[in-house]
């Protein structure tokens, strides 16, 4: 079993028009990941809830007009911000501008999201309930520079947000960082998205080059790791489910 490595443009295209684009990056049952681009003025999702999974967003560029909670409180989500919406919280979003919006969307567990996009099945999504659902305060919103930051000798690890079904971390490394030795997991999907720098992703006995915008996912049992060619690197690291990973980082 090999990890998956692709660029956003290589993801399975559900929509690809000048004004909007959506591509599937990962469709494992434990973690669905998509990449989306919306031109200014494009509508995103009407207010809704999920009963059984977390809906997460990481904004790569632009500004997302997010609305959450019983009162649909507005939250301006700028580039570098993570949002994790737990089950039972009403949420919706649009791109009110200025400019283009690009973001990653996480569903953990998947609960049929990519099958819904492919028009192959039902999805864990409901209209807002009569009681308004859970409070907006239950949503995790981590702005750029926020989160739990742990400074190591050759890197900084920041827990941007974590729930039992998903944790999202930011890994920022110095040129002397040697990487992550090959390993595997049996209880989670371990995924990375390159924000800055050049990365060597281990796939079996080979090392594949990953530039900014590359996505790398190791499903359970897949041997994976990272090599640093010698530069500064910034990576998102997504674990679905968390499976104790955030607490392990805190304990180091």
Language-model regions, residue ranges each:
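Short beta-strand His + acidic residue motifs that chelate non-heme Fe in jelly-roll/DSBH
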Residues: 45-47, 66-67, 75, 85, ...
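Short, charged/polar surface micro-motifs in flexible loops or helix N-caps
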Residues: 29-31, 39-43, 63-64, 110, ...
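A short, N-terminal "cap"/entry segment at the start of jelly-roll beta-barrel domains
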Residues: 1-34, 40, 46, 118-167, ...
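Short acidic-glycine-tyrosine-enriched beta hairpin
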Residues: 71-87, 205-220
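Double-stranded beta-helix
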Residues: 92-140, 225, 229-252
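Short, conserved beta-strand element in jelly-roll/cupin
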Residues: 37-39, 49-66, 106, 172-174, ...
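Short strand-coil-strand connectors
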Residues: 29, 67-71, 153, 164, ...
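Short strand-connecting beta-turns/loops that link adjacent beta-strands
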Residues: 29-30, 52, 71, 98-99, ...
